[in-house]
Amino acid sequence: MHSFARHRHSPAGKESAKETKGLILNGGWRYDLMGWFHDTFSFRGQWRELRKRTADLARIQPGEQVLDVGCGTGTLAIEVQQRVGRAGRVAGIDPGTRQIAHARSKAARRNLPIDFQTGVIEQIPFPDQTFDVVLSTLMMHHLPAGLKRQGLAEIARVLKPGGRLVIADFKRKQERQGRAARFHAGGSSMQDLMALVKDAGFSEMETEEMQPARFSAFPGAGFVRAYKN
């Protein structure tokens, strides 16, 4: 069974407080409810499609090391483990302790060696240049701009040179937000997100959109793919 080295990182050289916050993240019951909603109803298939498209855009290869930031109950990480195979390694971090417990249980039932840890994007608990790929789905909108900057800097730190980052998030200012989006902070501006990704040391950025299906609670999403310089 593969394992990752643990790392306690603070830019100032000291242990910093975990700061990730938001309506879902601060309200444990809301966070657990959304995890259950995603896994049970799958936005009428669109959450499943979003996971697949995220992994496809990342161009994940057998044997690679992949981190899922904001992994929730581990559904995407489990699917990614199947892509990297036993020679690869997958880790997931999430601020929700119940989410991580559920993710570990799901992986254990499938006998998958995924390293799920409670953690936040602004303090990723892994050494520099550990991962080939970092994924983030439907979590950036929880964060104010300052935490996005910190988190993207941390992602750049743990990615290997040339590593790939794929972010998928609800889009901002949808004409039909849908019930699911009301649990969140209004979605993300893809232009603003791309600027932050570039400032964090990424290049070759590409974007893609996923439109909502008719009568679906899913509000539509945007994807950003970029490579670490």
Predicted regions and their residues:
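C-terminal alpha-helical "lid/dimerization" subdomain adjacent to the S-adenosyl-L-methionine
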Residues: 15-22, 44, 164-225
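Short glycine-dipeptide loop
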Residues: 86-87, 159-164
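Conserved class I S-adenosyl-L-methionine
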Residues: 2-59, 75, 102
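A short acidic, Gly/Pro-enriched loop at the edge of an enzyme's catalytic core
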Residues: 122-133
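A short SAM/SAH-binding and catalytic strip from SAM-dependent methyltransferases
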Residues: 133-146
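A short glycine-rich, Lys/Arg-flanked "PGG" loop and its adjoining helix->strand segment in the class I
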Residues: 149-161
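Class I SAM-dependent methyltransferase SAM/SAH-binding core
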Residues: 67-69, 73-123
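Glycine-rich helix-loop-beta junction characteristic of Rossmann-like nucleotide cofactor-binding loops
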Residues: 56-61, 83, 124
